[in-house]
Each structure stands twice: as structure tokens, then as C-alpha cells.
Amino acid sequence: MRDYEQKMLQSQNYEDYFWESEDGLKLHCRDFPSDSDATPIICVPGLTRNARDFDHLGDWLDGSRRIIMVDLRGRGMSEYAKDSATYNPKTYVADIIGLMDKLKLPKAVFFGTSLGGIVTMIMAAAHPEKLAGALLNDIGPELDPAGLKRIGDYVGQGCSFDTWAHAARDLAESSGDIFPDFTLKDWIAFAKKIYTMNNSGRIKLDYDMKISEPFDSKGGGSGILWKALESLESTPTLILRGELSDLFSANVALKMLEILKQGVLVTVPRVGHAPTLEEPIALEAIDALLKRIA
């Protein structure tokens, strides 16, 4: 067992923090505090994911740097939106700016997985002064239609299970190609990040099914996102790509390096979309990124 996993078993090292969005939603994040003056990290999860995806990083950092994991509106412990049209990156950026204002954070290192990486790029374009560094996890300005179709086929499709083992087996069947080396124990841990137990004791997805309504599955490149990426030109940036990713191609990743003067690309072997950030090679790359940022 890795040291940070043991710490997770011993205690809860974070605080739950809530703030209100401009349209009155109660939003949530997990805040792992630190006595360090180092620039804090803000983690932004993928489309159907939540703050729990990043918990291990809080224990891995072990207080050396403050790290905050956001539940985007409609996910985890954040309130569901009254208008599904607000499930879009520009609104997520506004929500996170509100959080930074509440916490009096002038800037942060942004860790964005998938949708969270899109939010990070748009944040860089709209508020470049807020970013001290960036991790773009298996995401770029141009997306493969095959991966988007796969995501579009499952997002918003509600399902529930009797036990965590049932949920884990279903994930193993549907996502085995993404994590071919996962054991049953890994799948159960993965399920506990994606699902939650409802009041009836059923295991259900931990997000608002309406997040699927604004979802665009056409794929291709986005001129807006390529332009947004230019805002990270001189910012220390780590690009992680899953070797087996069906959403983020190697060609797009290399094209991004032509723009990012301080960009570093690391490929995570035998992983699809998206790396969990628990892989040793991912943690080594994250450590190297943070050493470049005060």
C-alpha cells in the first residue's frame, strides 16, 4: 500500500467548503489545507466526474501545497442547476472565479481532466492572471469524434445497482478497454468515485442526468479552444495523454507543444481516457510541474 493511501485510511484530511454561484446555487469543493505559501492547486473534474477523483492528490501532497477539488454544478455535493443550459464551460469558469474570490486566491495552478481541461483553457483566455500553471489531463482543443460518441452514448443514461460489486463489474465490462490492468479492487474504488448511495440504499450515478442536454458530440477542432490555448503559451503546462485514449490524439498533443513554450507532454502507458493521476508516471510528471511553480 502506498503511503498516501494509508493516510487516506487513517483520517479525513480535507474540509468541505460551500459557496454560492451568481445564480444562487450552493456549490461544493474539498479543501486540503497547507501551511505553505506555495501557489494552491484547483482541480476541475471531467464531465460526469466529481471532486473525489482527486482525493489521492491531497494525501500525496501531504500538506506541502494547498489543493482544492471542485464539484462542478450538478455533480457530487454541488446543487443541481435549475436551467440545464448553464451546464457549460463559461458558467463553470464563472463559478470557479466566484470560489477564488470567496477564498481570496489571486491565482492557482489548475489541474483539469477532460472537461476540466477545457474549463482550464477557457479560464486562461478569460482570466490569464489567475493561472500560475496548468495540467491538461487527456484533453486538447481538438477532440476525436470516436471518443465523443462513446461519451455521448452513456452520459445522462441513469442506472443503479444493488451493491458496489455490481457497479464495479458493470464498469469493468463497459470500460475494460480504458483500464486493461485494473483488478476488481481497482474497479470497486473507481465505482466509489463515480457512484453514490441514495436514500433507498441503491448505488446511483453521482450527477444530474441533465448535464447531457447541452453536450456536443460532433467532435473535431475548435478554433476558440486553439485560441484559448495560446493564453497558456508562457505558462508552465503539463499535458498528460493516455496511450489508449480515444478522445485525445497524439497528433493533437504534439501540435499543442508547438504553441506551449513551457509545455511538457507525458504519455501514460496502458491507459485510455483519462488517466486517474494515480499512475506513478503521472505523479512523477505532476511533481516535476509543481517544482517549476512557486
Q: Where on the chain are the PLM-derived regions?
A:
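Alpha/beta-hydrolase fold catalytic core
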Residues: 1-41, 63-64, 105, 287-294
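Conserved HGGG/HGGXW glycine-rich cap/lid loop of the alpha/beta-hydrolase fold
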Residues: 25-80
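Active-site loop/oxyanion-hole signature of alpha/beta-hydrolase fold enzymes
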Residues: 56, 69-111
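Short beta-to-alpha linker loops that shape the active-site pocket of alpha/beta-hydrolase fold enzymes
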Residues: 71-76, 140, 271-272
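Conserved hydrolase catalytic core segment
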Residues: 106-145
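Conserved alpha/beta-hydrolase catalytic His-Asp/Glu region
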Residues: 162-216
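Conserved serine/cysteine hydrolase catalytic core
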Residues: 198-258
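Catalytic histidine-centered segment of alpha/beta-hydrolase-like enzymes
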Residues: 271-280
